[in-house]
Amino acid sequence: MKKLLKSALLSAAFAGSVGSLQALPVGNPSDPSLLIDGTIWEGAAGDPCDPCATWCDAISLRAGFYGDYVFDRILKVDAPKTFSMGAKPTGSAAANYTTAVDRPNPAYNKHLHDAEWFTNAGFIALNIWDRFDVFCTLGASNGYIRGNSTAFNLVGLFGVKGTTVNANELPNVSLSNGVVELYTDTSFSWSVGARGALWECGCATLGAEFQYAQSKPKVEELNVICNVSQFSVNKPKGYKGVAFPLPTDAGVATATGTKSATINYHEWQVGASLSYRLNSLVPYIGVQWSRATFDADNIRIAQPKLPTAVLNLTAWNPSLLGNATALSTTDSFSDFMQIVSCQINKFKSRKACGVTVGATLVDADKWSLTAEARLINERAAHVSGQFRF
């Protein structure tokens, strides 16, 4: 049985190392009991059933580095089924679009192309009886998200009638032939959790863990890449809780009533894992169930534009003549995209369950180094080093 358990754990660790790297780290279930001697103070092995035992024997501290690198989190858009905007244009004549209608939301359950999240932090754990850890991390995180333009509700106004764009005009087309990507700044992040060795048999340990993490970075850069409207905004600002039409100065540098684009990231996770100690090496395999959300309060960011038209242009968008042979002289703004904007929707995990494989290297029962890979619900790697006081 021991040989079979060794083979299974080593095979899983090898598979995780050669496969693609895939929430929060599960960690080694043996962590609470691996470092039994202190770097500064000598470790004391206390027995909770010993009437002479004290809390000094029961409690110890560990500290170290915590690095978690998510290369591709599997996310989808959390949005309603309908989206209120102008009516879909029909025919070839210019028209005014001032009445809102509920149209099918192209962002509903849309999958994102890529979502990355990187965290570097300090780690401290309070250990009880060499069996249970209560820990926290304090550090910094930054991220990157990319998806089809429909996932961000990229919309604009096309074919508007008249020589001006009235304040009550609504966007009437959803732009699906583009990509939107955003980068966040590096912002403070924290997490708390608990881990325990629930069952031990010889060199095998079965444990469980719970974690919660949070961060609130600002969007550093927003890039919209679309053939009819392409723009990039550094430190974008937009409108929260504002329905169409947006204010007439939306997109102008001096616009008022805007707020910074901030993403509220939070995630919680429960997991279980099994380890087997082979001298100084402790491989482990586990499963986890996690939920992550990225919520920017559905902030809507307008394309940068000029405060007044120059050469009949308010933004650097191309003309779209279709089968027309000349620009319209009566409908000055009908042949290129107007009042373009995108919305940073709420994103959440598309897959909740994942698998974890990793190994811990222990030195003199005082120091340890852990490497871990996570699969299925994300592609991620985790490294940590810690010592016992």
Curated annotation (Swiss-Prot):
Q: What's the protein's topology in the membrane?
A: Multi-pass membrane protein
Keyword check for Disulfide bond, yes or no: yes
Gene Ontology molecular functions? porin activity; structural molecule activity
Keyword match Glycosyltransferase: no
Extent of the signal sequence: 1-23
Primary localization: membrane
Q: How does it assemble?
A: Part of a disulfide cross-linked outer membrane complex (COMC) composed of the major outer membrane porin (MOMP), the small cysteine-rich protein (OmcA) and the large cysteine-rich periplasmic protein (OmcB).
Q: What is this protein called?
A: Major outer membrane porin
